[in-house]
Amino acid sequence: MGKYFGTDGVRGVAGADLTCEMAMLIGRGAAAVLTSSTGHKPRILIGKDTRQSGDMLEAALTAGLCSVGADVESLGVVPTPAVAYLVRKYNADAGVVISASHNPMEFNGIKIFAGTGYKLPDEVENEIEAYIDNQCAGLKLATGDDVGRVTCRTDGIKDYTDHLYESIDGDLSGLNICIDCANGASAAAARQLFPRLGAKCTFIGVEPDGKNINAGVGSTHLDNLEKAVVEGGFDCGIAFDGDADRCLACDEKGQEIDGDKVIALLAMNMKEKGCLDGNTAVVTVMSNLGFIKFMESQGIRTEKTAVGDRYVLENMRENGYAIGGEQSGHVILLHHTTTGDGELTAGKLLKLLAKSGRKMSELNGIYAQYPQVLVNVAANAAQKAAYKEDKVLADFIENEEQKLMDMGRVLVRVSGTEPKIRVMVEGQDLEAIDLCAKRIVDKINERIIKG
């Protein structure tokens, strides 16, 4: 991670951490780097989610880009994976997403895709950070006809939906599904896509007001969807997050289907069809032990990376694997896209369900998960840095994991996107792992937060 760019772009509270001044500097730095690397006036797409601060940050970012000579094409509210796809379809030099994904509305972020549809390499982000650090001092600003122009595109959602329809290539006739769009960026595409595939659809979380993105809805708040599915007699439920780069689901009984389960189901299907490249699925250290053991039983290899879809993607690209993702619902299908895509993932899962002739609860029951306790400890940047340097705390955590022996594991890490230290304890004995997590959290509070 760089000074400003975390695992998923620049993130923070809009107007406080991520200011208009910062957005303009990012725009100027990005335009300068792209002009230098391409040798021409760059074309840059901008998409955003439904946060109230999105318009403000887009205006500042656009001003920065145009002031150094880049042309901007505004896509409006679109999913993050739509930008990753459209930057390639429209032969743009880069695509920018203004979103904080699953985070509350007061947060926002700026993430940049290269013209290839992949996130910018670290070295390019470092070049942009250098411009930010020196306030773009000495950077020649455009004048006259060299100033960038701004146009608005209205064809993005249709082109993206056409791409999804062709990639899913399925018939969902006979399925009755409830879809939660998190009051975010997925609604327009989802309302076109899933009925077009033949499903009977009921949509919730489709009334964004700038403030209610991810608020009690979407993939981080499945309760409402699970209740709606059971009460409405739906075959299953699908939930996206605010920018639709992740997807979780629930079966007809209201039981959650997490990213691990989705990856397992899709990977098994790909293996049957002979398209599971390398016979491997790439996951992160957060994946459940029950998932890992099940995949072994199916003869499918798993490779683990650090938490973050960018690390999953790096491994997939380096080794030629076709599927990877995270327990949180990021699933990357490299045969079709360059990033996590919630709507593509949902379509593939629903296609599998429709062809199986089985209930979603039967698919959901392919393996039993080990109990898992997750606790987030609020921590600022200084506290996160102190945690990384605390040898006494590291020894304490290692000792706690040893107490679980082969029946569980402990993972403590600092979040790359939020002001938190995340504590995860997993094992067969729920009471034991709950106590273990409590002891670790208490020790973190004692040494780092309150100390």
What are the residue ranges of the model-derived segments?
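Short glycine-centered, acidic/aromatic-flanked micro-motifs in structured strand/loop junctions
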Residues: 47-49, 179-181, 251, 335, ...
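Short glycine-rich phosphate-binding loop at a beta-alpha junction
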Residues: 39-49, 73, 176-178, 279-285, ...
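N-terminal small/polar loop signature for handling phosphorylated ligands or for N-terminal nucleophile
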Residues: 32, 36, 40-107, 192-250
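Gly/Ser/Thr-enriched, mixed-charge loops and adjacent short helices
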Residues: 13, 108-232
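Proline/glycine-rich low-complexity loops and linkers
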Residues: 75, 126-161, 166, 252-325, ...
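Phosphate-binding and adjacent anionic-ligand microenvironments
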Residues: 236, 273-451
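An N-terminal, well-structured beta->alpha segment
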Residues: 1-63, 67-68, 150-175, 384-385, ...
